[in-house]
Amino acid sequence: KGGGYIDTPYLILDHEMITALSQAAKRGIDVRILTPHHGDKWYVHGVTRANYWALIDDGVKIYEYTPGFVHAKTFVIDDEYAVVGTINLDYRSLYLHYECAAWLYKTKSVLDVRDDYLETLKVSQKITSADFNTIPWYRKIMFAFLRIFAPLM
């Protein structure tokens, strides 16, 4: 089917979420994640990027929106379901805050959300494993260090 498309400004995942996304991609599901190229908080953006590499190696496609800061929180699954709301993919949204979202099913709006997502990818940069090799070693260490504090973000 359509796969799973995720749009989130903050990608601060726990082990279970990384495993679920990776396993889906390994099974051949088209999993795509879109985050901003320019973050609004440098330390959160660093943790977001630190999560890319394990996902990319397992087949998840990561994109960064380059024209500016994207703050959308949307999920589209198999072109049949969509979620639009305030839920970030971070610890605070998933475990601490009370977030709000609309679940869309059996409505044309699901395809509208999907089409908007696909249009946004056209002005986004696909991130590859090769991109990780261009990051200086000291930034990689900083990303790893920041992941320790991920549950607080």
Where do the protein language model's features map onto the residues?
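PLD/PLD-like phosphodiesterase catalytic module centered on the HKD motif
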Residues: 3-5, 10-153
